[in-house]
Regions:
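General small-molecule cofactor/ligand-binding pocket signal
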Residues: 43, 69-71, 215-217
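Hydrophobic packing residues within well-ordered alpha-helices of enzyme cores
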Residues: 5, 35, 53-57, 185, ...
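Conserved core of the sugar-phosphate nucleotidyltransferase
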Residues: 109-193
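Conserved alpha/beta core of the MobA/IspD/sugar-nucleotide pyrophosphorylase nucleotidyltransferase superfamily
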Residues: 166-237
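Acidic donor-binding segment of Leloir-type glycosyltransferases
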Residues: 48-69
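N-terminal glycine-rich phosphate-binding loop and ensuing alpha1 helix
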Residues: 1-51
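Alpha-helical elements of Rossmann-like donor-binding domains used by nucleotide-donor carbohydrate transfer enzymes
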Residues: 30, 52, 86-87, 115, ...
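Conserved beta-loop-beta/alpha segment of the NTase-like Rossmann-fold superfamily
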Residues: 65-143
Length: 237
């Protein structure tokens, strides 16, 4: 709910709506405009300050909002991020042949997201940042070259208890080439998994593929905007 971000703002804001100078500099506007011509529909899942989100899209994104579906997550305050992904997947059009998932607090370059969306494989993204437990989602491949994600919600320490062949900082963008399998994964989540992070769904889907079956796309310019300082760094990059 943007708690780290709002430490640096005069009043509480939804961080994907925060901007300086012009609304076009908000993360949601930047993200949507970068992918707009590459996809058939864009699903935005909100919860915290949902009315602000609706109003911003209606008033500041008129040029693209006809392609948007806006979905309300009524458990944003007591469930983890996985429920937002689950709610988004529920409204994906039946005829969709692939799904690209992007976390809402990211800043990235256009060329990298184009590589993700145009890939002919399932895609895992990585970035060039150091792996720091207080903010990174780490990705490693085990001795058999299957992927595993690790993240500490308390931002304390990360632990790996098995041999691994590679380790990356996740770019927190993924492409699912098999929507039917995504829906199947979601269908068999336990109540506890539904309340967890989005890595529950992501791990169950991608954990079945070896590295050679995936396209690992390195995002050239990448910021996870946890703070206003992160946001400013991204805009000035």
């Amino acid at each position: 709910m943007s708690s780290r971000f709002n430490k640096d703002t005069k009043e509480d804001v939804l961080k994907c709506l925060y901007y300086e100078d012009t609304p076009a500099n908000s993360l949601i506007s930047l993200q949507v405009h970068k992918v707009y011509d590459l996809v058939d529909e864009i699903i935005v899942v909100g919860g915290y300050k949902y009315e602000d989100l609706k109003q911003f899209i209606r008033e500041q994104m008129k040029d693209v909002n006809h392609k948007l579906k806006l979905v309300y997550n009524d458990h944003y305050h007591d469930y983890g991020s996985g429920y937002s992904l689950l709610k988004g997947i529920e409204v994906v059009s039946e005829q969709t042949d692939e799904i690209t998932f992007i976390e809402g607090d990211l800043f990235f370059d256009t060329e990298s997201v184009e590589r993700i969306i145009s890939s002919k494989k399932d895609v895992i993204s990585v970035n060039n940042e150091p792996i720091l437990s207080q903010k990174a989602v780490a990705l490693y491949f085990d001795a058999n070259n299957y992927p595993h994600y690790i993240y500490d919600t308390s931002h304390s320490c990360l632990e790996i208890h098995e041999p691994f062949t590679a380790i990356f900082n996740s770019g927190q963008m993924w492409k699912f080439r098999n929507p039917s399998r995504v829906r199947e994964v979601c269908q068999f989540l336990t109540p506890e998994q539904e309340q967890g992070t989005n890595l529950e769904i992501i791990q169950k889907y991608f954990g079945a593929y070896k590295m050679s079956q995936l396209d690992i796309v390195r995002v050239s310019l990448w910021y996870n905007c946890n703070t206003v300082s992160d946001y400013r760094d991204s805009i000035n990059s």
